Amino acid sequence: MMYAVIAAVVSAALLVYFTVRIVREPKNSDCVVYIPRWLFFLGLAVYVFGAGVGVAMLAIGRFFFAIPGLLCMLFGCAAMLCCLNQKVVSVGDGEYVYSTMFGREKRFNASGYVRMIRNSDSLTLKFKNGKMHIDNLAVIGDDFKNSLIEGKKD
């Protein structure tokens, strides 16, 4: 029963954290590439379902059956993190800041664009100073596409 209480408290704390982040987060108006908000709410639903299953199974002492619930919580957290953190923001003429799922940022210049690699579930943009991973669910702005084309011509 103690495990169920701890799991419920941790689940509720994470739920409050993610909900506050999405409410405080400004709209994606300044982003040239972003993950749509519906993915956050899908992740939230999966997280809540997983937390319910996990806490219920821990409460009745079925530790083995709590594992699928905990895995659902992990997938829900990953979806919410992607929606909140993974984006590309324009900071000037042809300069962009890419933020990963975990919030790590890197600057890229459109003139440093080398090539694009299409994967089954994403795009990888190669630049002279690194690479940028863009998920297939991401919304890509026309300005970003055009600046990459212009950068490739130079």
Residue ranges with predicted function:
Residues 43-54, 66-79:
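Small-residue hotspots
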Residues 1-7, 60-73:
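Hydrophobic alpha-helical transmembrane segments
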Residues 124-149:
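Canonical phosphoinositide-binding patch of PH/PH-like domains
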Residues 91-93, 118, 127:
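Generic beta-strand structural signal
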Residues 96, 105-121:
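Phosphoinositide-dependent membrane-docking surfaces
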Residues 1-57:
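N-terminal membrane-targeting/pre-transmembrane regions
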Residues 25-28, 58, 89-96:
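Membrane-helix interface/capping segments
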Residues 71-107:
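Conserved beta-hairpin
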